[in-house]
Amino acid sequence: MASTSIMLSSFFSFFFLTFFVTYAQQNVTVHTICYYDGGNFTSNTSYSLNLNRLISSLPDLTPTINGFYNISINGEVNAIALCRGDVKPNQDCISCITTAAKQLVESCPNIIEANIWLEKCMFRYTSRIILGQMEPVPFSYTSSNVSVTDKEGFSKGLGDLLDSLGAKIDAANETKEVKFAAGVKGTIYALAQCTPDLSESDCRICLAQIFAGVPTCCDGKTGGWWTNPSCYFRFEVYPFFDLSVTSEQKQPLSSHNNNTRRSDQGKSKDRSKTLIFAVVPIVAIILGLVFLFIYLKRRRKKKTLKENAENEFESTDSLHFDFETIRVATDDFSLTNKIGEGGFGVVYKGHLPDGLEIAVKRLSIHSGQGNAEFKTEVLLMTKLQHKNLVKLFGFSIKESERLLVYEFIPNTSLDRFLFDPIKQKQLDWEKRYNIIVGVSRGLLYLHEGSEFPIIHRDLKSSNVLLDEQMLPKISDFGMARQFDFDNTQAVTRRVVGTYGYMAPEYAMHGRFSVKTDVYSFGVLVLEIITGKRNSGLGLGEGTDLPTFAWQNWIEGTSMELIDPVLLQTHDKKESMQCLEIALSCVQENPTKRPTMDSVVSMLSSDSESRQLPKPSQPGFFRRSASFSISLNDVSLTDLSAR
């Protein structure tokens, strides 16, 4: 299924493991991605007919020397297929590609763009031109459940093997027929591969990004793999590829061989060099002028946008607090007044001269929130007025100091109650239900009730504050994005937020919309119902909360999900309805998730009259305890810890 990678765990014997790999590995799905945000097609349309034609033509492909295929039907459907470098480019290769294509269209019905990696081949199709395009995202990586005994020695061996693979890939790049390398270091077996249509530099960049991420993906583990549309890497502690290819690998040419080649080629090559030296400077000058024009045009546009933003920010001068006033109000930011801390800074309680209690967020100089995020939070919050959103009183700027001044919420954040074994008893079912309803109404206001749609992008329990009646207020808008009503989705290369709450299409592809907030809301509701953190302890190894809840729901053991603290106070029908709403919100396909308008409507209706669609599997769904997917548990350097 989409966004799901599978990793073989350890078996009881080497013989059984080897048998399974050699017999079944070709048809094991490593990674499938359905680009839901890329659009759909309907049956009997031109795209549908051409895609079917392309799929049906695959068994008749003619074997190529490198197992790579670029296929296009009427320029409307474009596909790329590639067999692993150790697979003979014969009918076995074509059979794997055909199987992959059939699995892909079944997994991603009516989706315009999708890709799949099987053990021995990959296949992708789309409506756009992809030949020769290096695309390191979307990516997926998976690690073994088994840890190595000698982590330091294993890491050194793997590092040496990565260096060796890189050198072999560079040598393979010279042929431009196959960009593949495999190697063995002690008991570690590894391979790496790029699609042959990539340039030498693009292949090197693609694999360099993968190699740099290996410690994050698989540190101390006995195996792991990483796939993206353009390249692939895998390592194990058992032979999973044809070992004969390691002896056939082309090594970097020595200087002696290079000199011999130059002598053999003679004067014809010298003439070619003369021509190249004459043409290259002219082409470089032309390209330089083109790039300079584009750069100046973009800079002028950015300058205009920046000036507009600065003018809008200056219009908030009435909300500006004197820095000394805030410093005195917090007793010089005394530790005794500290009420919270996050990745962006520390929050203090304070009292203004008129007696008004305030909460002051003092942004850290080294925090992930820069001036842009600070201004975003100020500009957005000044436009928002809703009882379930925290109220911004103002801000203060002095040199490198940046302060945000909010209304003081006495009970701090939801997570401090929900996951505290003592305080959680204060949250009976009625209070938890009111929190769910309040957060849903706050999100609905952001998505549909404010001047422009706003996507929060970092909804989680620590960003939900509780007032004196334990009613919720959504806070922290530094990562929020504002849209116009005609365009409520976007793609970003900088993924920010908290991983366990991120929708799969956002975490893996950078695509976000109002449905990414819906996913985060679903995770939050599951935490409120169960009293458990997502990816927390007590769920079983390698299991996140949506998977844990889904498994109980399909097995008919949903009541086991209810926080034991609630057993005497919860309304069974109401809690089960909330569970189904949450599971609907964390579905893998964003188009199947309800809108917040639908969620509020379902929560506001009588429990007997609610019509809930049957939810499908959640994003990052883990099919078995025998398999592990590391995506929910990893922190990326691009993420801002909050």
Swiss-Prot record:
<dbReference type="GO" id="GO:0016020">
    <property type="term" value="C:membrane"/>
</dbReference>
<dbReference type="InterPro" id="IPR038408">
    <property type="entry name" value="GNK2_sf"/>
</dbReference>
<feature type="binding site">
    <location>
        <position position="361"/>
    </location>
    <ligand>
        <name>ATP</name>
    </ligand>
</feature>
<dbReference type="InterPro" id="IPR002902">
    <property type="entry name" value="GNK2"/>
</dbReference>
<feature type="modified residue" description="Phosphotyrosine">
    <location>
        <position position="406"/>
    </location>
</feature>
<keyword id="KW-0325">Glycoprotein</keyword>
<keyword id="KW-0723">Serine/threonine-protein kinase</keyword>
<dbReference type="InterPro" id="IPR017441">
    <property type="entry name" value="Protein_kinase_ATP_BS"/>
</dbReference>
<feature type="binding site">
    <location>
        <begin position="339"/>
        <end position="347"/>
    </location>
    <ligand>
        <name>ATP</name>
    </ligand>
</feature>
<feature type="domain" description="Protein kinase">
    <location>
        <begin position="333"/>
        <end position="620"/>
    </location>
</feature>
<feature type="domain" description="Gnk2-homologous 2">
    <location>
        <begin position="136"/>
        <end position="240"/>
    </location>
</feature>
<keyword id="KW-0597">Phosphoprotein</keyword>
<keyword id="KW-0732">Signal</keyword>
<feature type="transmembrane region" description="Helical">
    <location>
        <begin position="275"/>
        <end position="295"/>
    </location>
</feature>
<protein>
    <recommendedName>
        <fullName>Cysteine-rich receptor-like protein kinase 27</fullName>
        <ecNumber>2.7.11.-</ecNumber>
    </recommendedName>
</protein>
<keyword id="KW-0547">Nucleotide-binding</keyword>
<keyword id="KW-1133">Transmembrane helix</keyword>
<dbReference type="GO" id="GO:0106310">
    <property type="term" value="F:protein serine kinase activity"/>
</dbReference>
<keyword id="KW-0675">Receptor</keyword>
<keyword id="KW-0067">ATP-binding</keyword>
<keyword id="KW-0472">Membrane</keyword>
<keyword id="KW-0418">Kinase</keyword>
<feature type="glycosylation site" description="N-linked (GlcNAc...) asparagine">
    <location>
        <position position="70"/>
    </location>
</feature>
<feature type="modified residue" description="Phosphotyrosine">
    <location>
        <position position="506"/>
    </location>
</feature>
<feature type="signal peptide">
    <location>
        <begin position="1"/>
        <end position="24"/>
    </location>
</feature>
<feature type="glycosylation site" description="N-linked (GlcNAc...) asparagine">
    <location>
        <position position="40"/>
    </location>
</feature>
<feature type="domain" description="Gnk2-homologous 1">
    <location>
        <begin position="29"/>
        <end position="130"/>
    </location>
</feature>
<feature type="modified residue" description="Phosphoserine">
    <location>
        <position position="462"/>
    </location>
</feature>
<comment type="similarity">
    <text>Belongs to the protein kinase superfamily. Ser/Thr protein kinase family. CRK subfamily.</text>
</comment>
<feature type="topological domain" description="Extracellular">
    <location>
        <begin position="25"/>
        <end position="274"/>
    </location>
</feature>
<feature type="glycosylation site" description="N-linked (GlcNAc...) asparagine">
    <location>
        <position position="27"/>
    </location>
</feature>
<feature type="glycosylation site" description="N-linked (GlcNAc...) asparagine">
    <location>
        <position position="258"/>
    </location>
</feature>
<keyword id="KW-0812">Transmembrane</keyword>
<feature type="glycosylation site" description="N-linked (GlcNAc...) asparagine">
    <location>
        <position position="173"/>
    </location>
</feature>
<dbReference type="GO" id="GO:0004674">
    <property type="term" value="F:protein serine/threonine kinase activity"/>
</dbReference>
<dbReference type="InterPro" id="IPR011009">
    <property type="entry name" value="Kinase-like_dom_sf"/>
</dbReference>
<keyword id="KW-0677">Repeat</keyword>
<keyword id="KW-0808">Transferase</keyword>
<feature type="glycosylation site" description="N-linked (GlcNAc...) asparagine">
    <location>
        <position position="145"/>
    </location>
</feature>
<dbReference type="InterPro" id="IPR000719">
    <property type="entry name" value="Prot_kinase_dom"/>
</dbReference>
<dbReference type="Pfam" id="PF01657">
    <property type="entry name" value="Stress-antifung"/>
</dbReference>
<dbReference type="InterPro" id="IPR001245">
    <property type="entry name" value="Ser-Thr/Tyr_kinase_cat_dom"/>
</dbReference>
